[in-house]
Amino acid sequence: MKLSTKALAPAVLLAVCTYAGSAAAQQSFSSLTCRAGTITGIAKAQDLVVFGIDQRGIILADDAAKTFNNNTQRCIGSIAIIRGKSSGGGFCRNIDPATGDTTIVEWTSAEKPGTGTFKYLSGTGKWSGITGGGDYQTAAVTRPVDEGTYQNCVRVKGSFSVPKM
């Protein structure tokens, strides 16, 4: 069976319009995220330290749209520092205080301690279908208030899009 161009034109137009209507533009954001957490040692050798982290914090947006402002955050993961180079990763759940909607983020640390990248894996409510990501860099490190803990802030920059409903 041979399909004519005239027969396919309405279907193609419908598909393009449907896709264009559901697509969303990338939106940039930036924030300072401050958190406190616990460190659990897993291994320690001459040129190697491996530890797990469990942290909680708050996102302080500094972009004009105040994207993710006052979202609370919980992250877990593990990090290894081998001969001064860092590697590791984990996951974070961010909660919008106004709606309870969440985003789930996967983070990966870079070789330089305190830096890395992240990407959005999923979201609920207004964040359903979120995609995007960015990078982070340590902005402030303090002396731990208690042994086995840490407190710090990271500068976060990225972009995301959410399909229009």
Regions found by a protein language model. Name each.
Residues A11-L13, A23:
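Cleavable N-terminal signal peptides
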